[in-house]
From Swiss-Prot:
NCBIfam families according to UniProt: ispZ (TIGR00997), PRK00259.1-3 (NF001325)
InterPro entries linked to this entry: YciB
Function: Plays a role in cell envelope biogenesis, maintenance of cell envelope integrity and membrane homeostasis.
Organism: Burkholderia mallei (strain ATCC 23344)
Transmembrane segments annotated in the record for this chain: 3-23, 49-69, 72-92, 118-138, 149-169
UniProt keyword annotations, A-Z: Cell inner membrane, Cell membrane, Membrane, Transmembrane, Transmembrane helix
Principal subcellular localization: membrane
PANTHER family hit by this protein: INNER MEMBRANE-SPANNING PROTEIN YCIB, INTRACELLULAR SEPTATION PROTEIN A-RELATED
This protein's name: Inner membrane-spanning protein YciB
């Protein structure tokens, strides 16, 4: 259910794009992300840092898209967000000694420290690659193809990455 909740702004962006175009879709994505943050704050009293970062990036890049009437800003948004996540994972680990992946998943999994480090780096590399891939699609495909990639391509890539990660992690999990 959380996965669908996380996709909420992207799904609404996709639907609005198909019905009304990129600029309305951008406004819908901003509103949906604001609503998402408000809902999380209301329900849980605490909003994850990643969601705050997502809100900030969509407001800045979506706002620039609407004010300047230039769709390139909203198209760059995923790359900026993915690269911020990648840098955040690496910086938190090596500058501040905190493994954010372990912090997010540590209650569900018991893994040796070197495995947590590999997992953290794998996610950082994955986010960096998603950012590069987004730029490639923006530069080489139509706006409509980019929107399809944004929903289906990145979501599919994340699902495949999580499955591969789960298969890799299986050898480290202790039977209880």
């Amino acid at each position: 259910m959380k996965f669908l909740f996380d996709l909420f702004p992207i799904i609404l962006f996709f639907a609005a794009f198909k019905l009304w175009g990129i600029f309305t879709a951008t406004a819908v994505a901003i509103a949906a992300t604001l609503a998402q943050v408000a809902w999380v704050a209301f329900r849980h009293r605490k909003v994850d840092t990643m969601l705050w970062v997502s809100l900030g990036v969509i407001v800045v890049f979506g706002g620039a898209t609407l004010v300047l009437h230039d769709e390139k800003f909203i198209q760059w948004k995923p790359t900026v967000l993915y690269w911020l996540f990648a840098v955040g994972l690496v910086a938190a680990r090596y500058a501040f000694g905190k493994n954010l992946i372990e912090k997010m998943m540590g209650k569900q999994l018991t893994l040796p420290e070197p495995v947590w480090d590999k997992l953290n780096l794998a996610w950082a590399a994955f986010f960096a690659a998603l950012g590069v891939t987004n730029l490639y699609v923006v530069r080489n495909f139509t706006e409509s193809q980019w929107v399809n990639f944004k929903l289906f391509g990145t979501t599919g890539a994340i699902v495949v990455f999580v499955i591969l990660q789960s298969l890799w992690l299986a050898k480290y999990l202790k039977e209880e």
